[in-house]
Regions:
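Short, acidic/polar
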Residues: 19-34, 125-131, 252-263, 332-341
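The substrate-binding groove and active-site-proximal loops of carbohydrate-active enzymes
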Residues: 10-22, 43-62, 107-126, 151-156, ...
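An acidic-aromatic substrate-binding cleft motif
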Residues: 1-24, 29-38, 285
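Aromatic-lined substrate-binding rim segments of carbohydrate-active enzymes
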Residues: 26-106, 130-133, 234-242
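Polysaccharide-binding and catalytic clefts of secreted carbohydrate-active enzymes
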Residues: 102-269, 273-293, 298
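Conserved, mostly hydrophobic/aromatic
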Residues: 13, 32, 40, 69, ...
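Carbohydrate-binding surfaces of carbohydrate-active enzymes
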Residues: 200, 204, 232, 244, ...
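Short, well-ordered coil/turn segments that N-cap beta-strands
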Residues: 7-11, 36-38, 70-76, 138-143, ...
Length: 425
């Protein structure tokens, strides 16, 4: 299937109507359309706006916004809000929380603090997705759905009690007996033999910090499977309600996920979150001679390997940083154009800039969008308009598929194993 529009390359942006006064909505959409932005992604962090209390659903807020979007002629990608469970949920059901390897729960206050394997959380996620898809799936302006947001970003290891229980079930299904598990894990070494399934856990703190490497590999396979099951659960629900031609995607790429499996079972195509100036992150060492932001071609190549047609859900448009640190500088003049064309050259049919307005509050207060805090026109907005003119001239390549001259085999088992079985950085 084509992404969004098989006749041309499409530009978009990420918009958060819940962050802004409703009086700005029409103005914002009008300004977007004027510079060539035709699609917005919304709602991926807005669980409370739809379900302010358990089982209590209120559609008024996004009904009003979608009315404005339809009136303006703006197309919309709806995000399922499961990346940020509300406070009422985690307070009532702490078993939904993820934990560190020492068992300490990750509490409410940031995002991605849940685990995939809590039966309660899966049920509550299924409920919110069912209600959202059932209510908004038929809207004419809604053209697609994003599952969750950045699955396995921030946290890609899970150590809650729910994960231990699910890990045991995963191993029982895989091996069938403790005898076969012990053999596969070489458990006779250092007297690690298991005699009861209740003795088997996800990795836990040890004297030296190391864990049985065979156990660890199975554990990372289990995380990948758990992530895919979570995505598949949401996709199966959404497909019951979407219109013909609407799509389901999610945004990546992050660790401990077999994206090829996800593309085959859950989503229509993958989208990538592209922040090339992470190459200049002062928190991470990088060699002075490396390719910096130009090495992003490798990431785009991996994205294309997941689905031959793909999109960019978040393309860097400003400086990036949380309230606790700055991670990437503002794009120089022309860099947004360079990165957009780089993505399109690799096969992207859709490029969406993060975000429209820079937020004036919250953890991402320093994560700049197209517009700065003032909301006034600036050079980045003008550059988006220039990009639109360029991509309009490239309309004949929309839907085209990239032909690679060289292929690289990627094996998830080897990647997972190499995280722990390594001798140098």
């Amino acid at each position: 299937m084509q992404i969004l529009n098989g006749e041309k390359i499409t530009l978009g942006t990420c918009y958060y109507p819940e962050h802004w006064d409703e009086a700005l909505w029409r103005e914002d959409l009008s300004r977007m359309l004027a510079c060539g932005i035709e699609v917005i992604r919304i709602a991926e962090f807005a669980w409370n706006k739809i379900e302010p209390a358990e089982g209590v659903y209120n559609y008024d807020f996004f009904d009003r916004f979608l009315d404005v979007a339809e009136e303006a002629g703006m197309k919309v990608i709806m995000g399922t809000p499961t990346a940020t469970p509300p406070a009422w949920l985690t307070e009532k059901y702490p078993e939904c929380l993820n934990a560190g390897i020492d068992g300490t729960l990750y509490r409410h206050g940031l995002r991605r603090h849940y685990n995939y394997n809590s039966p309660v959380y899966r049920k509550l996620c299924g409920n919110i997705v069912e209600h959202m898809a059932g209510h908004y799936g038929g809207r004419s302006c809604v053209i697609g759905w994003q599952i969750d947001n950045e699955l396995n970003c921030e946290a890609n290891e899970f150590y809650s009690e729910s994960d231990t229980a699910a890990f045991r079930g995963y191993l029982q299904k895989k091996y069938g007996s403790l005898e076969k598990l012990n053999e596969a894990w070489g458990a006779v070494f250092w007297n690690q033999t298991y005699t009861d399934w209740k003795e088997v856990y996800v990795p836990r703190p040890t004297v030296s910090g190391g864990v049985n490497p065979h156990q660890t590999l199975d554990y990372l396979r289990f995380i990948s499977e758990s992530t895919n099951e979570f995505a598949r659960m949401q996709a199966d629900i959404i497909r019951k309600y979407i219109k013909e031609g609407d799509f389901i995607t999610t945004n990546g790429l992050f660790g401990h996920v077999d994206y090829q499996k996800m593309a085959g079972e859950s989503i229509d195509f993958i989208t990538y979150d592209s922040y090339p100036n992470f190459a200049y992150d002062l928190n991470n060492y990088s060699d002075k001679d490396e390719m910096k932001d130009r090495k992003w071609s490798r990431n785009l190549t991996e994205t294309r390997a997941v689905s031959r047609i793909f999109g960019i859900m978040e393309q860097q448009s400003g400086a990036g940083g949380w309230n606790s640190r700055m991670m990437q500088p503002t794009p120089r003049r022309g860099q947004m154009t360079l990165w957009t064309m780089q993505s399109i050259a690799h096969g992207a049919d859709f490029v969406s800039y993060f975000r429209w307005r820079t937020c004036t509050f919250g953890t991402e207060i320093y994560w700049h969008g197209i517009l700065d805090y003032s909301g006034r026109d600036n050079r980045r907005l003008a550059e988006v308009g220039d990009i639109y003119k360029k991509v309009t001239a490239l309309r004949e390549i929309a839907g085209g598929e990239y032909e690679a001259a060289v292929g690289v085999i990627k094996d998830y088992d080897n990647i997972f194993d190499a995280e722990y079985d390594k001798w140098h950085e």
